[in-house]
């Protein structure tokens, strides 16, 4: 925008606001307003005709290109999964020769159709789209003139408001008289300019509308016959398609069902089609803990063999001798979940502070539920570290209470069995059907015996129900209070 245009826009801004809010005196011409409305419709419909014609031509060409790509994809699907050609001498062919041949024939027909329809599609571009674009250029020039007329209308209304303001003064001064004459001259000039553009548009817009009707009529007829020719060519070529692989005489749904057979049932029988990512991650984590923790660095056996937590002056004889004190180390600690509360308070055969600290350090890396693996506690490393009881303790009854910090490897296997708690059970909240091998199925309300579980209910637990052992999601059950 030039500086002159900018100054005019600034001077017209107040009148634009008045016109928008219907304030002050405004010039109206119903005849031009009706012509302006029809002109806007003409502009919109011409744009729509041009865009839709171009979209139709592009869509037909794109459809044929898509069908060629579809035929190529079907050829790849019919080939074996290795991507290599099958052995023609094989008893059972790995690929589908009939399907590949049908795809190649269909691709050839569509490619030929695309070449045949190229002149018709080019004709749509030449006879419909190009004339519409030329008409839009003419409409753009007329739109500029209509904008010019609207600007002159704003100037006329602005000068009329100024003239009326000075004319209504009851006691005008000399300067007011001078401003009145100046405003009157501006009104006369603005009126002449506005009348010129307004009369020009009112006179010539109806002529444009009549010419537009004569212009659109042949375009519509041409576009109709072009589409008819394109559809007729498509219908005839596809109707005469001689591909034995396709049965065009039978019902399409029946043919599809007959060729599909029991493929859907065979696919549903595959395990990978029912794969659940969340369950598989939890199972993988549980498998790692179950089978990989025995050799891990934090297991009780590895901790004892490495000697972590033992002092330099460790004495095995002292570690195995019972202490005559009351409850020994850890008696004030809260009762461990693995100990029966009714037997608490009897004398405990716990070693010295050094031995207790050592056993606690070794048991810190233990995994609950895995201590039956340490039945061979009479091995030399464990005996030397004080984990074997004295002969007097082995001959007499096992102690009624075992220190939680030294469980599960602080005593002999007999002591571990005696300290085992009651069977922990859970009640099923929902029905669960096994999703894979190793899962445990159960109905809602079933009481399941816990073999191994974790504190997190969102992980998989191991249980036993109806003589079967397997894993199940922890959030499907509720722990029973003993």
From Swiss-Prot:
Recorded GO MF terms: actin binding; calmodulin binding; cytoskeletal protein binding; identical protein binding; protein homodimerization activity
Annotated ranges, domain BAR: 17-254
Span list, region Disordered: 382-407
Residues in SH3 domain copies: 421-482
Localization in the cell: Cytoplasm, Cytoskeleton
Any single Pfam family the record assigns to this protein: SH3_1
Modified residues (N-acetylserine): 2
One GO term describing the cellular component: cytosol
Glycyl lysine isopeptide (Lys-Gly) (interchain with G-Cter in ubiquitin) cross-link, renumbered residues: 242, 481
Gene Ontology biological process terms from the UniProt entry: actin cortical patch localization; endocytosis; lipid tube assembly; mitotic actomyosin contractile ring assembly; plasma membrane tubulation; protein localization to cell division site; regulation of endocytosis; vesicle-mediated transport
Main location: cytoplasm
CDD domains in UniProt: BAR_Rvs167p
Coiled-coil intervals: 31-64, 174-204
Post-translational changes noted in the entry: Phosphorylated redundantly by cyclin-dependent kinase PHO85 in association with PCL1,2-type cyclins or by MAP kinase FUS3. Phosphorylation inhibits interaction with complexes involved in actin cytoskeleton function.
Keyword terms, alphabetized: Acetylation, Actin-binding, Coiled coil, Cytoplasm, Cytoskeleton, Isopeptide bond, Phosphoprotein, SH3 domain, Ubl conjugation
Family annotation (SUPFAM superfamilies): BAR/IMD domain-like, SH3-domain
Modified residues (Phosphoserine): 299, 321, 379
Comment field (misc): Present with 14600 molecules/cell in log phase SD medium.
Function according to Swiss-Prot or TrEMBL: Component of a cytoskeletal structure that is required for the formation of endocytic vesicles at the plasma membrane level. Could be implicated in cytoskeletal reorganization in response to environmental stresses and could act in the budding site selection mechanism.
Quaternary structure note: Binds to actin. Interacts with ABP1, GYL1, GYP5, PCL2 and YBR108W.
Name the record gives this protein: Reduced viability upon starvation protein 167
Organism per entry: Saccharomyces cerevisiae (strain ATCC 204508 / S288c)
Lineage, broadest ranks: Eukaryota, Fungi, Dikarya, Ascomycota, Saccharomycotina
């Amino acid at each position: 925008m030039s500086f002159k245009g900018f100054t005019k826009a600034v001077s017209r801004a107040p009148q634009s606001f008045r016109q928008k809010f219907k304030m002050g005196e405004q010039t109206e011409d119903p005849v031009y307003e009706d012509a302006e409305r029809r002109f806007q419709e003409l502009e919109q419909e011409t744009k729509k005709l041009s865009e839709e014609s171009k979209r139709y031509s592009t869509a037909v060409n794109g459809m044929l290109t898509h069908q060629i790509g579809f035929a190529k994809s079907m050829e790849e699907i019919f080939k074996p999964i290795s991507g290599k050609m099958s052995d023609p001498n094989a008893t059972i062919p790995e690929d589908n020769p009939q399907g590949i041949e049908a795809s190649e024939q269909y691709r050839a027909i569509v490619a030929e159709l695309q070449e045949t329809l190229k002149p018709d599609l080019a004709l749509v571009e030449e006879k419909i789209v190009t004339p519409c674009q030329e008409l839009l250029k003419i409409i753009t020039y007329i739109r500029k003139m209509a904008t010019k007329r609207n600007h002159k209308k704003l100037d006329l209304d602005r000068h009329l408001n100024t003239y009326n303001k000075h004319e209504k003064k009851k006691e005008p001064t000399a300067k007011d008289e001078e401003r009145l004459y100046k405003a009157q001259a501006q009104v006369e000039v603005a009126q002449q300019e506005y009348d010129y553009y307004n009369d020009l548009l009112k006179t010539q817009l109806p002529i444009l509308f009549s010419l537009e009707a004569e212009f659109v009529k042949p375009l519509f007829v041409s576009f109709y016959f072009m589409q008819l020719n394109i559809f007729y060519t498509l219908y005839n070529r596809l109707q005469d398609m001689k591909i034995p692989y396709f049965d065009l005489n039978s019902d399409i749904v029946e043919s599809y069902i007959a060729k599909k057979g029991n493929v859907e049932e065979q696919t549903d029988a595959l395990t990978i089609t029912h794969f659940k990512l969340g369950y598989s991650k939890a199972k993988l984590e549980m498998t790692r803990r179950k089978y990989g923790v025995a050799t891990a660095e934090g297991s009780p056996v590895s901790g004892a063999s490495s000697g972590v937590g033992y002092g330099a002056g460790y004495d095995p004889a002292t570690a195995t001798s019972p202490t005559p004190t009351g409850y020994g180390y850890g008696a004030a600690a809260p009762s461990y979940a693995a100990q029966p509360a009714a037997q608490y308070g009897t004398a405990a055969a716990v070693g010295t502070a050094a031995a207790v600290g050592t056993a606690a350090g070794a048991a810190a890396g233990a995994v609950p539920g895995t201590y039956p693996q340490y039945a061979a506690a009479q091995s030399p490393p464990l005996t030397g570290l004080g984990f074997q009881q004295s002969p007097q303790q082995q001959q007499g009854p096992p102690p009624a209470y075992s220190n939680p910090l030294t469980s599960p490897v602080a005593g002999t296997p007999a002591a571990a069995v005696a300290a085992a708690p009651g069977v922990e059970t859970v009640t099923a909240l929902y029905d669960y059907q096994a999703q894979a091998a190793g899962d445990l199925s159960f109905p809602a309300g079933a009481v399941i015996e816990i073999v191994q579980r974790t504190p997190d209910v969102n992980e998989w637990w191991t249980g036993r129900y109806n003589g079967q052992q397997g894993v199940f999601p922890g959030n499907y059950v509720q722990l029973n209070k003993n």
